[in-house]
From Swiss-Prot:
Alphabetized SUPFAM superfamilies for the sequence: a domain/subunit of cytochrome bc1 complex (Ubiquinol-cytochrome c reductase), Transmembrane di-heme cytochromes
Function, in words: Component of the ubiquinol-cytochrome c reductase complex (complex III or cytochrome b-c1 complex) that is part of the mitochondrial respiratory chain. The b-c1 complex mediates electron transfer from ubiquinol to cytochrome c. Contributes to the generation of a proton gradient across the mitochondrial membrane that is then used for ATP synthesis.
Name of protein: Cytochrome b
Record carries keyword Chloroplast: no
Protein's membrane topology: Multi-pass membrane protein
Transmembrane segments annotated in the record for this chain: 33-53, 77-98, 113-133, 178-198, 226-246, 288-308, 320-340, 347-367
Amino acid sequence: MTNIRKSHPLIKIINHSFIDLPAPSNISAWWNFGSLLGVCLMLQIITGLFLAMHYTADTTTAFSSVTHICRDVNYGWLIRYLHANGASMFFILLYLHIGRGIYYGSFTFMETWNIGVLLLFAVMATAFMGYVLPWGQMSFWGATVITNLLSAIPYIGPNLVEWIWGGFSVDKATLTRFFAFHFILPFIITAMVMIHLLFLHETGSNNPSGLNSDSDKIPFHPYYTIKDILGFLFMLLTLMTLVLFTPDLLGDPDNYTPANPLNTPPHIKPEWYFLFAYAILRSIPNKLGGVLALVLSILILMLFPMLHLSKQRSMSFRPLSQCLLWALVGNLIILTWIGGQPVEHPFITIGQLASAIYFFIILILMPTTSLMENKLLKW
């Protein structure tokens, strides 16, 4: 009799995805981030569900309901901070996952990569709308500033903004719809993750060498299940340290002041994980130009398969490209720092330079370096 694991229509799918899945024998810890992101998504959905049970999406009571969760609900403070810092964890893992994809040439799996970029957009939208829900000062003004960017779209812009607001300013209607979207999007993300995995399992995983690994595969369970569990423990340790010792480390103190449409905070800035994009947005004096640069800074990821001119898939054996990638990482760190600074003399210039360098490295330097390395192979 065949094992139920292999014969049952539903369990069979799980078996082919997580148990008997043939995986390359040499994938490193950089391949742990996919499963960590899955765990993070589940954690966010569970904590979010419990928060939604006590939260009220109304401008008069939203801020108080969050306070009530933290003070009066059993372990409400823990659930709230797990959810808030879980988002930061999510983005750390997401950026590492994307970095891994760029370094090892995983973007050559076009379908998987493009679904991944769409996933990034969906997660960013979800995080932005979630930040609006506590209805603090930064929530309100962040929502006002970011939604206002859509007014830069020619002809339909102003109408579009009012349509999204549900009125002539960010108000009750905006908060209610943002809560609805923030609730539904993670489930859409979960469905997209399944498609992401479906496409990945069509081709099989990439590996650090960038070479075909069909001749040397091992079963996912127990080898990589145990390796993933180690990753979960590290992630949990980091997250719990953050939540239990410094829960407000990554937050903005302004968000502990209830939203006041009559008082603008001195520095409006998003959460840390959006600062690099915010810096790119601010570095262009023109509104529409800034919005385009902002969208392109993420959308540029879709161009990676086209910009890949090297004869080798992975960067493992390409030291010059490695240097460029690490320069890009450094540049992104500088952009993140600039995004959190006021719009004043040295920061404006640094931001503009870093933004230009960001696009220059990806669009010009990386492809030309790849061609040069191809030449060096013959030399």
